[in-house]
């Protein structure tokens, strides 16, 4: 939500020591920073195509093959028996192409986006010194800038900026409630 890069290998080690599986929502990270599921140590990583400019409605779950995973729905043998239903082939192909494009120039694009993000942050901070950066200053995704502007209504600011800037005043799944991440 705020672009913070968590110390997954360390968290995974703690979980393993306690006999707990670890899931990480890697949708924001996939295609923007290197992701090696084995090095990260998470038992489950979820990905989403639309975060890569791919089609909406398709994602992937990478999971540790050593774990026994029980299906939530029963039916056909699709997706290794974990989820029944007809596979959405056009969405799968769109996801694969979006991933291929994102991964083909990941390092250079990440560096460029990081530079643009930092330039935007510095420019905003010079004009409005009371701005607050949400999350870690450096351990963050290159394409995400999450800020708080004290005393300014997020919805009013969003309405004023939305025709010129890709922005939001909350998460897509927030239902108008303040973010529990930002409130913590």
Regions of interest found by a model, annotated:
Residues 1-184:
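Pyridoxal 5′-phosphate
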């Amino acid at each position: 939500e705020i672009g913070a890069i968590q110390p997954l290998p360390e968290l995974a080690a703690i979980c393993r020591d306690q006999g707990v599986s670890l899931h990480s929502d890697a949708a924001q990270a996939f295609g923007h920073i290197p992701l090696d599921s084995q090095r990260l140590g998470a038992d489950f990583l979820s990905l989403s195509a639309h975060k890569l400019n791919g089609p909406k409605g398709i994602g992937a779950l990478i999971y540790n093959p050593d774990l026994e995973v029980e299906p939530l729905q029963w039916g056909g043998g699709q997706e290794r028996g974990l989820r029944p239903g007809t596979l959405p082939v056009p969405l799968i192909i769109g996801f694969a192409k979006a991933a291929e494009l994102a991964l083909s120039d990941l390092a250079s694009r990440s560096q460029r986006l990081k530079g643009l993000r930092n330039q935007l942050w510095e420019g905003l901070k010079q004009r409005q010194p009371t701005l607050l950066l949400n999350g870690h200053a450096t351990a963050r995704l290159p394409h995400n800038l999450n800020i708080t502007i004290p005393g300014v209504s997020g919805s009013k600011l969003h309405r004023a900026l939305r025709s010129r800037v890709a922005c939001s005043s909350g998460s897509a799944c927030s239902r108008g409630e303040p973010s529990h991440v930002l409130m913590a």
